[in-house]
Amino acid sequence: MGCSQETRVGEKPNILFVIGGPGCGKGTQCKRIVEKFHYKSFSTGDLLRKYVKDKKEGYEEIENQMKEGKLISSATLMKVLKEYILNEENKKILVDGYPRNQENIDEWEKQMKDHVVVKGALYIEVSNDEMKKRLLGRNEGRADDNEETIGKRLETFEKETKPIVEYFERQKNLIRIDGMKTVDELSEDIANKFKEKGLA
């Protein structure tokens, strides 16, 4: 796949999931991938926060779940994702922060399998202690970034999302990256993997 954004009519979107715990640096790396390889990046978290901010239908439930560090329902996420992906002109798409559990995968398979090509999952691996330190140290004014909620988010990640890493590993399309490195080193490792896997 080249860097051109020109696509053939009817071409299926190529999807690369980006997974990792809270504070692992997914957002920063997605921005760099967009700049270097001309992907379109979509963060489920950003879209959900926008949904709440715009006070769209059912936003109260989503807002409460986010404040409590709970996962948003698969049906809610899938509705938003499907609309976004199938209407996106750029067919090289990063999905940041999804799937988060087996239910997400099942919902995706049911609704998206025939419409897209999943190229794999990029997993940025960072220790829990480091993720907690990063989250407590950043100041983005997020309601879901206090110490108690961070603990819940990390717990949820261990329980729900770690098995997703194993799922993609079994599918032989997991790209595992050491997220304990500097931002620039991490970007370089990802770029090398993209070239190696034909994702550039």
Locate each region found by the language model.
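Glycine-rich phosphate-binding loop of ATP-dependent small-molecule kinases
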Residues: 1-200
